Amino acid sequence: MSSEFIEAGAADRVRILSEALPYLQQFAGRTVVVKYGGAAMKQEELKEAVMRDIVFLACVGMRPVVVHGGGPEINAWLGRVGIEPQFHNGLRVTDADTMEVVEMVLVGRVNKDIVSRINTTGGRAVGFCGTDGRLVLARPHDQEGIGFVGEVNSVNSEVIEPLLERGYIPVISSVAADENGQSFNINADTVAGEIAAALNAEKLILLTDTRGILEDPKRPESLIPRLNIPQSRELIAQGIVGGGMIPKVDCCIRSLAQGVRAAHIIDGRIPHALLLEIFTDAGIGTMIVGSGYHEAHQPWQ
């Protein structure tokens, strides 16, 4: 068939698949931990795109793990029961009543919805919270006056490794308990980073509501596509990385220091952001790499 009769759209799809081949080969059998939150949880079109991306990762031989929060839905349910959401230094103040709502929403509603959507899309998802099987052991946060807000004390990866080996997709909510069984609300970025480290993951990917790390927050086109750990720390010291981006970058740095090969901060408002970041030469966000990182196919060099 002559090339002029080939539909342009079909040719584009084949070109994209060809571009993805080195990445498909490199990442087959590797674990990728995705923190799912932000706008990607609020818009139906974006929800569907994320679920399709996650199932795609599993279908091409990767081992996706999903860790999620659910801030907007928590706020909505707190409003229904007459509790005013309160925050201190970016952390949700979590008294006993708030903790009960957080646990109900994250474990009983958001988690089950994600599991159902992945399964409906053709994946095999299994829902967890950090308390299940003592997957995540919590401890109280160092900051005083914020109630039942926790940090990750340890991760028991043996709970989910057998599932990954059999092709299941773990979906984990960021609620965990301490040694005494007290439940804590933990930042989902933190949980994702620690689980990625425990699984020796290839990638940690944070879906956010920003393009990535910007040289100038007022200029979306100033995206920094790739950084190492010292460069990331320097951007924090210079104030270029500030506000809510600091804990995300810190989370990435901690996971890299514990053996994760690359951490990505990407814009979850873009449909199919996961696939665009992992399987295209240009990517769409910021990738932070550790000192020993080596990529067989390095598009930015």
From Swiss-Prot:
Species whose genome carries this gene: Synechococcus elongatus (strain ATCC 33912 / PCC 7942 / FACHB-805) (Anacystis nidulans R2)
A single cellular component GO annotation: cytoplasm
InterPro entries: AceGlu_kinase-like_sf (IPR036393), AcgluKinase_fam (IPR004662), ArgB (IPR037528), Asp/Glu/Uridylate_kinase (IPR001048), Glu/AcGlu_kinase (IPR001057), NAGK-C (IPR041727)
Gene this chain is encoded by: argB
Chief location bin: cytoplasm
Pfam families from the UniProt entry: AA_kinase
Source organism superkingdom: Bacteria
Pathway: Amino-acid biosynthesis; L-arginine biosynthesis; N(2)-acetyl-L-ornithine from L-glutamate: step 2/4
Feature type site, description Transition state stabilizer: 35, 248
Family: Belongs to the acetylglutamate kinase family. ArgB subfamily.
One of the GO BP terms on file: arginine biosynthetic process via ornithine
EC number: 2.7.2.8
Places the protein is found: Cytoplasm
Protein name as catalogued: Acetylglutamate kinase
Catalytic activity from the UniProt record: N-acetyl-L-glutamate + ATP = N-acetyl-L-glutamyl 5-phosphate + ADP
GO molecular function annotations of the record: acetylglutamate kinase activity; ATP binding; identical protein binding
Amino acids binding substrate: 70-71, 92, 185
Record NCBIfam families: argB (TIGR00761)
